[in-house]
Amino acid sequence: MPHSLRQTLSRQDTFTVRNKMDKNEVISFFDIHSTTWDENMEKDDSKMNEILDVAKISSGNSVLDIACGTGVMIDYYIERNVSKVTGVDISSKMIEIARNKFKKYDFIDFLCEDAEEFNFKYQYDRVMVFNAFPHFPNPKALIKNLAKAVKSGGTVTVAHDRGRKDLDNHHKSVQASKISNGLISENALEEIFKSAGLVDIYKKATEDIYIVSGVKA
């Protein structure tokens, strides 16, 4: 492989922080958009189920849903007959809406916490980060913390229902670039997963979907 191409690939596969994000700005952005979040959400069932299949979410699983927002993924977990869901989000307004939507389910609970730092007391079968990864200021700290929150043999999955370029363009269109580091390459995320002790890494990154999933050894 030519040296110049190796350098290009190396740059693409190395994570660098694009923005020094202020978590208060992240909270403010999602608080402001919480009331219109569901009406602006377009869900593609085929993509959602592909993501859930890769994450191996199935009957009886306990699921930790990171940056759950208003609970976009929770109906899909319910359809798969999971045993427990804990939704976590840094936005209190998002959490308030999610709690109201799913208050009749006693196996679903919500926490307004910072997932990069929160000490999870329970270990889950599956951990999901859907449509949120670029909004975490320290993704390495996030994955390291989530790896502690998953059982041995369980999965941690980062997924988006858009490709990297499409997501960057979307963030620009909704004035969210300031609170986004951009979606890093699947290879760079694989290295972060490995450094957190996750193995058997699955990667898929196309123009319209992005999935990286690993198993806790």
Name each region found by the language model.
Residues N181-A196:
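Short alpha-helix
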Residues G197-L198, A205-A217:
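Core SAM-dependent methyltransferase catalytic element
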Residues N131-A132:
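Short catalytic micro-motifs in class I SAM-dependent methyltransferases
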Residues L5, L9-K56, V72, T157-L183:
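Conserved class I S-adenosyl-L-methionine
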Residues A141-S152:
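A short glycine-rich, Lys/Arg-flanked "PGG" loop and its adjoining helix->strand segment in the class I
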Residues L64, T70-E117:
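Class I SAM-dependent methyltransferase SAM/SAH-binding core
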